[in-house]
Amino acid sequence: DVKAAESAYASMERQLKEEMINYARNHPEYDEVKVDADEIWHDPYVLMAIISACFDGQDWTLETAMPVLDKYFKLQYIVTESVTTQRKYRTETEQRYNPETERMETVTLRVPYAYTVCHVRLENRNLSHLPVVSMSHHTMGMYALYMATHGNMEGIFHGNPYAVPLKDPMLYDIPDETLASSPTFAALMAEAEKYIGYPYVWGGASPETSFDCSGFVSYVFTNSGVYNTGRLGAKGLRSLCRNVPAAQAEPGDVVFFEGTMGDGVDGITHCGIYVGNGMMIHSGSPIGYANLNDAYWKSHFHSFGRMPGL
């Protein structure tokens, strides 16, 4: 049933792609059709986790899962249409009698007409971004559990280019002297390291739902007792911090990145907690450590910031 559900969802996507390709042919009422479409794709492990969470871990079949597939397909793919009308001119000729020459003559006319252009926008809202806006807290927790284990079916979608496999978290031992030098930083790390290995869940902000990047940083600062940030996004966390030059960054500072979500998303898009020696702990995929000297993080680095309380 898992593979059948994936096949059914992929079939819906193929139909949508065909609809976009043939939009002009299927809408002859427009003089011109312009289509701006996001890539049509989904991670099949995310789909499996959504279905399983919606059934609260109980058995399901393709037939019983179809309403869930339909619901999330409509949430994921949004098609909007707008029509503009332009005033254009065409050239026509007609025969007219010229009384001066007493002859019929061909006259060229510039005739106005309405030219309709249909602008079609297909937005892919990313299937993994939908649980937070469509599930209860309990169901989100179930979703996070399935994302952490892939339902113990890792490899079932082998060969699917959009299937993101489970990864082991990167581990790192913070030097004892670094922890001993700052009880505040030690409190942060005592809280942060509880969640190593938890999956990245868009919109997640608690151990029950797991975390996204800003949810993780917010939760760790708040529940370590260092500083109550509330639940903020990455940009909101940056606004709380005072700027710190990279050369003066200290363990416990927050490190911010930009451009990690691809084109079209401006500003700060990711954050983590700096732990010294060029390392950070963050909600990646999964929560773990990362080396800031890696080419990827260097290319997306935005700034360091220091929270109140540090």
List each language-model region with its residue ranges:
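Intrinsically disordered, low-complexity
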Residues: V2-P199, S299-L310
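Solvent-exposed, acidic/flexible segments
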Residues: T178-F185, T209-S214, Q248, V265
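Catalytic cysteine-centered active-site loop
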Residues: Y198-P251
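Aromatic- and glycine-rich peptidoglycan recognition patches
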Residues: A234-K235, S239-A247, M261-L310
